[in-house]
Amino acid sequence: MGMNNEKTVILFSGGLDSTTALYWAKKKFSAVLAMIVNYSQRHSIETEMAQQVAKNLDVEAHLISFPLKNIVYSALIDKDKKIPGSLETSKNAEGVPITYVPFRNGIFLSLAAAFAESRKIYHIVTGFNLIDSPDYPDTTETFTKKMEDAINQGTSASITGNTFKIHTPLIGKSKKEIIRMGLELGADYSYSISCYRGKEIPCLKCPSCDIRDNAFKQLNMEDPLITRLKKEGKR
């Protein structure tokens, strides 16, 4: 993978996908700025771990507070809503996952674009992938391209000729493939948090835990997060 002698901003949640994307960005760009968004999500431990991962990699991290709890409704934000226990029970009557946060990725990309534009950075990296979450409308290639077009039209890029590029290195990959890619890049997943219930110790029951657990089993290896928790006596 050739090094791009430019900077990039990465939308970094601290989850497994964005951790893989962070390692990819470190190999691809000369400097990486991690934008970590606290949007009043239930799994706020993710932002704490995200800052730890960024520190471990000597990546400049920026924690952005942008609460969505008074704007949107989602089981990932509203603690009174029940987190689904399986993929089969994870959708509402309209077929939309109850863990979908309305237009979250659109909001985050807008924040990232403003953040990047202010620093004259024209690359944005995301950990979006579609195969494991096909019913999330804001993770598709079409959505990402439309957002890229909107950013290029609605920022100074339309005047200066500088062009924003949104990178989606995980699009089209399964969770197993994402983990394998990360391991090849030297990724440490021991601090990556995926559980929807908002605890460092995963429940191993929610859809996110289920997908992650199955992926590591397919690779015949223990989840590095579980390994770390065992060593620390937390599990």
Language-model segments: residues:
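Iron-sulfur (Fe-S) cluster-binding modules
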Residues: 29, 37, 225, 231-235
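Iron-sulfur (Fe-S) cluster-binding segments and ferredoxin-like electron-carrier domains
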Residues: 201-230
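Short, Lys/Arg-enriched, disordered terminal segments
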Residues: 1-6, 231-235
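Alpha-helix boundary/capping detector
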Residues: 141-142, 150, 208-209, 232-235
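Secondary-structure transition/capping residues
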Residues: 123, 158, 189, 217-220
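Immediate flanking context of iron-sulfur cluster ligation sites
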Residues: 184-204
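ATP-dependent adenylation/nucleotidyltransferase module used to activate substrates
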Residues: 2-185
